[in-house]
Amino acid sequence: KGRPAPVSVWCSAASTGEEPYSIAITLIEALGDSAARSASILATDLDTQVLAKAEAGIYTYDQVKHLSPERLKRFFLKGTGLQAGRVKVRPELRAMIRFEQLNLTDADYGIAKPFDAIFCRNVMIYFDKPTQGQVLSRFEPLVKPGGLLFAGHSENFTYVTQAFRLRGQTVYELTRDAAQGMRPRVAQAPAAAAMPSPVRARAAGAESAYGDRG
């Protein structure tokens, strides 16, 4: 709360979608239902196969067992027939998120507007220090003044960059000096990567197999 609307978030390692959907749920619960209309989440990953699963938004009960019954009913549809034992995110939750393929080691991400927060958790541990520094330098113009960078518990960027200062155990804030040195990006956002058609077909075919939870 306290950030001017509309709120924008980048989940830079979306995997199969649990994190971006959790962020969307948190925004709705923190800001109210209006967040579903104004907030936006960019969810990216290098792997288009996991992105296809994320875009489908279908999970087993075991994958969502940590959610309360109230959250399950509010944000998910219950599978029936061949989809029994599964849940699917509701369309209004899915509409908050844009899924795209992106490689964090690319020189230019093609993202034009900065975010209120970037989630990059448990990814940097696979990069050496020079690569970590390069990725963090690309994050600088993509974080709004006072914006946050969320890292994993095993990641520490204190000795990698001076642009972000540690604010909490795994939370970094863009420093004032870095924010004042920001330059507008003119690159256009790339078109969303095409997802594997079999996954899209299966998701479309299962659309009618989900309904409100009883």
Segments (PLM) and residue ranges:
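Conserved beta-strand signature within the Rossmann-like core of class I S-adenosyl-L-methionine
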Residues: 145-153
